[in-house]
């Protein structure tokens, strides 16, 4: 039982360290950036935040595409 708990903890630490290394190297997008890309605001009532443009057809703020 103790061996299973220890190996589970070590496995979780390994996964966390790989994720942290990937985030630091830019291989995994930051969750905040992902949430901003998914942000949909109604244009007429609110102005779009920086990096977003108003899609007049859908009446929603969409991420600006370069």
UniProtKB/Swiss-Prot annotation:
Keyword Glycoprotein included in the entry's annotation: no
Signal peptide: 1-22
Tissues in which the protein is found: Expressed by the venom gland.
Organism of provenance: Ethmostigmus rubripes
Cysteine-cysteine disulfides: 43-54, 48-61
Protein name (database record): U-scoloptoxin(04)-Er2a
Family from the record: Belongs to the scoloptoxin-04 family.
Keywords for this protein: Disulfide bond, Secreted, Signal, Toxin
């Amino acid at each position: 039982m103790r061996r299973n708990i220890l190996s589970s903890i070590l496995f979780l630490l390994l996964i966390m360290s790989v994720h942290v290394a990937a985030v630091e190297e830019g291989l995994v997008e930051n969750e905040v950036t992902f949430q901003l890309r998914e942000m949909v605001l109604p244009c007429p009532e609110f102005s779009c935040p920086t990096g977003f443009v108003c899609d007049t057809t859908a009446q929603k703020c969409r991420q600006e595409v370069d």
